[in-house]
Amino acid sequence: MVNDQLHIIMPVKDSIAIAERAIHAIVDCGYTLCVYDDNSLPENAQRLDEIANDKHIQVVHISSLTDHPSPNYRLVLQQSQQQALIENKHLLIVESDVIIKANTLNRMLEEVQEGVGMVAAVTVDEQGEYNFPYHYLHRLRYRFLSKKTIDTKKRFSFCCTLLTNELL
């Protein structure tokens, strides 16, 4: 079942092998996403188009929107915000090297409530170690084992972040 509460985006520039794994991790969970190709090499842009043959994947080539050289993260965020508002959905940003687990996005959606602007997933590497900027969590790990939500004033990464429609 494709979720209708999220407009999911993934900015990509080359690194197609890991990006393809990240894309399929989202689609395999029943979600659709929009991949923003930020001026990848021609063969990589072509591979993204081949991947987009799946009806749950749309590829937007930034070169069709601007001639500004990469990175174009601001433009991607502006376009995505506008689309999420049109669709009345939350905006979810997933970086192209983040392989989500099956329940991650549903768990993030469960945290959306009035007054919450952002919900971020703490990402880990393949060995289960916290990724930067979450290194400080290893010292506090025992405190978080029983909590679904961690209120933090520390920095967080946009590696896998949901921006609520209310915030947009």
Mark where each language-model region is:
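A conserved acidic beta->alpha catalytic loop
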Residues: 37-48
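Active-site-proximal specificity loops/subdomain of glycosyltransferases
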Residues: 55-85
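Short beta-strand-to-loop acidic/aromatic patch adjacent to the donor-nucleotide binding site
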Residues: 88-99
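Conserved donor-nucleotide/metal-binding helix-loop-beta segment in metal-dependent transferases, i.e.
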Residues: 103-120
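Short beta-strand-to-loop element that shapes/binds the nucleotide-sugar donor at the catalytic cleft/hinge
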Residues: 119-133
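Short, flexible, basic/aromatic active-site loop/helix in glycosyltransferases
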Residues: 122, 134-154, 158
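Conserved nucleotide-sugar donor-binding
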Residues: 157-168
